[in-house]
């Protein structure tokens, strides 16, 4: 009886060689990140981020573990909790293709103003969750005198009613408006880059990337903390995702909220597919390794993209802040669900620290 040996075919040999090369590359970028970011506190470069984002699925657990170690070493174990509310919803003149608040699209969102007593009530409810930050948001290109006056009145009433840091997100600002917000005690200002410079014209045409940067730089110069984030999953390439992380790292914001596209009816991106959960987790780890000391916050779209299990994995993969409750035009997880998860993971909520 003749026994035939299983001789690998040419294709099998090629596949095995490819897997070995991929494993070696994965080990190399992870070891580089461990030495450069974890040990020395220096973020990955754009080229290194591209390599990291190409890690295969089997390397994802190790990547998330490394990002978690970086977060613990360079940021500590505390998790910052924030609530947000819109003082003006809808009717925005800008054409951000992902946003249902644009007045240029056939979106179901309609213009609504929130009165000051409701704003104060929301601030109290946010503080009751243990949150240290309350962000007032308006869907505008830039605030007019009426809105600025309302913001000043709202800040005064909130400060009288509850002890919480106040942040604002009011679009692009003039130097005078930046100075006013700083004088009124605004702790942090949010103005997102959203996507990479090279992809920005594909998702926004009514203003430029440079205009966004100008506001960000003025905010930093005025002494307010800059919150400047990303919206990923809009059709950008892996390379553009790395580009965005590197551009944010160069800007050095205090906080980076990570949003994942939740396609909204009536917007140009309504038919864009949902980002793969593993790609989202890879991005979370990559942004942490690009910015080892930055507050990296879970923001919109995580419920749809990651679900409950993915939310947990992200908190163990570089995230150290969350927005609790609902977002501007979409529903979030109940605050109790996120707070219970933090307790389960033994992650203490950061205590309130008034900085301004």
UniProtKB/Swiss-Prot annotation:
Assigned keywords, A-Z: 2Fe-2S, 4Fe-4S, Biotin biosynthesis, Iron, Iron-sulfur, Metal-binding, S-adenosyl-L-methionine, Transferase
InterPro entries per UniProt: Aldolase_TIM, BATS_dom, Biotin_synth/BioAB, Biotin_synthase, Elp3/MiaA/NifB-like_rSAM, rSAM
One protein family per Pfam: Radical_SAM
Annotated GO MF terms: 2 iron, 2 sulfur cluster binding; 4 iron, 4 sulfur cluster binding; biotin synthase activity; iron ion binding
Pathway annotation from the record: Cofactor biosynthesis; biotin biosynthesis; biotin from 7,8-diaminononanoate: step 2/2
Any one of the GO BP annotations: biotin biosynthetic process
Gene3D superfamilies: Aldolase class I
E.C. numbers: 2.8.1.6
UniProt keyword Protease present: no
Catalytic activity: (4R,5S)-dethiobiotin + (sulfur carrier)-SH + 2 reduced [2Fe-2S]-[ferredoxin] + 2 S-adenosyl-L-methionine = (sulfur carrier)-H + biotin + 2 5'-deoxyadenosine + 2 L-methionine + 2 oxidized [2Fe-2S]-[ferredoxin]
Region (Disordered): 1-28
Signal peptide: none
Residues the record lists as binding [2Fe-2S] cluster: 135, 168, 227, 297
Residue positions binding [4Fe-4S] cluster: 92, 96, 99
Cofactor: [4Fe-4S] cluster; [2Fe-2S] cluster
This protein's record includes keyword Glycosyltransferase: no
Residues in Radical SAM core domain copies: 77-302
Biological function: Catalyzes the conversion of dethiobiotin (DTB) to biotin by the insertion of a sulfur atom into dethiobiotin via a radical-based mechanism.
Protein family: Belongs to the radical SAM superfamily. Biotin synthase family.
Assembly description: Homodimer.
Matches recorded under NCBIfam families: bioB (TIGR00433)
Protein name (record): Biotin synthase
């Amino acid at each position: 009886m003749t026994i035939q040996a299983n001789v690998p075919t040419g294709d099998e040999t090629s596949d095995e060689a490819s897997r070995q090369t991929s494993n070696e590359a994965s080990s190399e970028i992870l070891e580089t990140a461990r030495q450069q970011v974890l040990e020395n506190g220096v973020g990955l470069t754009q080229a290194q981020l591209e390599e990291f984002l190409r890690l295969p699925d089997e390397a994802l657990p190790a990547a998330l573990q490394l990002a978690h170690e970086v977060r613990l070493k360079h940021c500590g174990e505390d998790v910052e909790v924030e609530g947000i509310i819109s003082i003006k919803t809808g009717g925005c003149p800008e054409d951000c293709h992902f946003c249902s608040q644009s007045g240029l699209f056939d979106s179901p969102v309609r213009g609504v103003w929130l009165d000051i007593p409701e704003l104060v009530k929301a601030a109290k409810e946010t503080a009751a969750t243990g949150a240290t930050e309350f962000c007032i948001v308006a869907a505008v290109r830039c605030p007019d005198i009426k809105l600025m006056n309302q913001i000043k009145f709202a800040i005064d009433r909130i400060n009288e009613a509850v002890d919480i840091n106040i942040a604002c997100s009011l679009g692009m600002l003039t130097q005078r408006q930046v100075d006013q917000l700083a004088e009124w005690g605004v702790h942090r200002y949010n103005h997102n880059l959203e996507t990479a410079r090279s992809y920005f014209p594909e998702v926004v045409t009514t203003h430029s990337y440079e205009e966004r940067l100008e506001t960000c730089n003025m905010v930093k110069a005025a002494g307010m903390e800059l919150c400047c984030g990303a919206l990923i999953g809009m059709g950008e390439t892996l390379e553009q995702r790395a580009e965005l992380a590197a551009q944010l790292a160069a800007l050095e914001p205090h906080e980076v909220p990570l949003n994942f596209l939740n396609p909204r009816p009536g917007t140009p991106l309504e038919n864009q597919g949902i980002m793969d959960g593993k790609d989202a987790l890879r991005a979370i780890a990559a942004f942490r390794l690009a910015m080892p000391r930055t507050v990296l916050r879970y923001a919109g779209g995580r419920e749809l993209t990651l679900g409950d299990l993915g939310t947990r994995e992200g908190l163990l993969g570089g995230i150290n802040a969350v927005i609790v409750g609902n977002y501007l035009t979409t529903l979030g997880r109940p605050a109790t669900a996120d707070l219970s998860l933090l307790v389960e993971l033994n992650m203490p909520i950061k205590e309130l620290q008034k900085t301004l």
